[in-house]
Curated annotation (Swiss-Prot):
InterPro entries the record matches: Homing_endonucl, Intein_endonuc_central, Sporu_reg_WhiA_N_dom, Sporulation_regulator_WhiA, Sporulation_regulator_WhiA_C, WhiA_LAGLIDADG_dom
UniProt family annotation: Belongs to the WhiA family.
Keyword DNA-binding: yes
The name this protein goes by in its record: Probable cell division protein WhiA
Entry annotated with the keyword DNA-binding: yes
Ranges of the DNA-binding region feature: 278-311
Length: 314
């Protein structure tokens, strides 16, 4: 099961403490996955579709707790591509439907369809958190923290996407909106922001798993950087030692090491004897002890002599 699916299953078990929070969450779920159906007799029903059984159960429970009305649940199995079940939670036409639509913010007081989210649904911060939870359950996903950090919510309405982005902004989340074919995507890319969003909507187990994976990933990346740095330094050291030996052998085989001043001859002989030694180790072998810069200076002088030989200047 993906990290996103595990997160949604956790959120499907989170119950809003107040009726106002449960109403806000249900309203968001209907905004994301629901539709109004009006029959020829002007009878109104609400259809909410999801592929997640836990979310379908939550929608059913929220409607029962809030309104105590008749609900229909239909299950259809897909036959093409993914063979997941599709769950239809339906509020059929019945007495008091107008009041239900009004409380959900789907119509105004005069019975006209309401496109925007009614402000009175989200007066409290707890209701705003519940609404965002419903939004994520209805159309959200989050990447595994082991990969690229990314959390998104997809909706077909640009105005609703902008509203979600603005609502996230009230919690100091720097969400952005982009277009993906016919869909509008509200997304977060920063790991800290994703962690905060999971905290806001009540996905605390997912948050802890995300943090653990993020820490492991950060440590692994840091170790890799250190290893790469050490490898690069080692390669430089090896390349330098090979160059130094080439210079020394050239001098030895042409004019002879005895032609060099004593300090240079001493370091040349040590380099031949200890080809894998570091500059510090070479310096420690000389009496009095020589610093790394001192050893490097002598080897550089040897290099200059070798270059003169290569260019024909004896």
């Amino acid at each position: 099961m993906s990290f996103s699916a595990v997160t949604k299953n956790e959120l499907a078990r989170v119950a809003g403490q107040r009726p106002c929070c449960r109403l806000a969450e249900l309203s968001a779920l209907i905004k994301m996955d629901g539709s109004l159906q009006i029959s020829a007799r002007q009878q109104v029903s609400i259809n909410i579709i999801t592929e997640n059984a836990a979310i379908a159960r939550k929608i059913f429970t929220l409607i029962k707790d809030l309104f105590g009305i008749n609900i229909e649940v239909l299950v259809k199995r897909k036959t093409r591509l993914r063979k997941n079940n599709v769950y239809l939670v339906r509020i059929p036409p019945q007495q008091g439907m107008g009041e239900i639509l009004n409380r959900l913010g789907m119509v105004d007081g005069a019975g006209r369809l309401e496109g925007a989210v009614r402000p009175d649904l989200l007066r409290r911060e707890c209701c705003r958190r519940a609404f965002l939870r419903g939004v994520f359950l209805g159309g959200g996903s989050v990447n595994s923290p082991e990969g690229t950090y990314h959390l998104e919510v997809i909706t077909g309405s640009e105005s609703f996407a902008r509203y979600i982005c603005k609502l996230m902004g009230r919690f100091r989340l720097a969400a952005r909106v982009s277009r993906r074919k016919k869909w509008h995507v509200v997304y977060l890319k920063e790991s800290d922001q994703i962690v905060e969003f999971l905290n806001i909507i009540g996905a605390h187990s997912a948050l802890l798993n995300f943090e653990n994976a993020r820490i492991y990933k950060d440590v692994r990346n840091q170790v890799n950087r250190l290893v790469n740095c050490e490898t690069a330094n080692l390669n430089k050291t090896v390349d330098a030692a090979v160059r130094q030996l080439e210079n020394i052998y050239l001098i030895r085989d042409t004019v002879g090491l005895a032609q060099m001043p004593e300090p240079l001859r001493e370091i040349a002989e040590l380099r031949i004897k200890y080809p894998d030694a570091s500059l510090k180790e070479l310096g420690d072998m000389i009496q009095p002890r020589l610093t790394k810069s001192g050893v490097n200076h002598r080897l550089r002088k040897i290099g200059e002599i070798a270059e003169k030989i290569r260019s024909g200047k004896k």
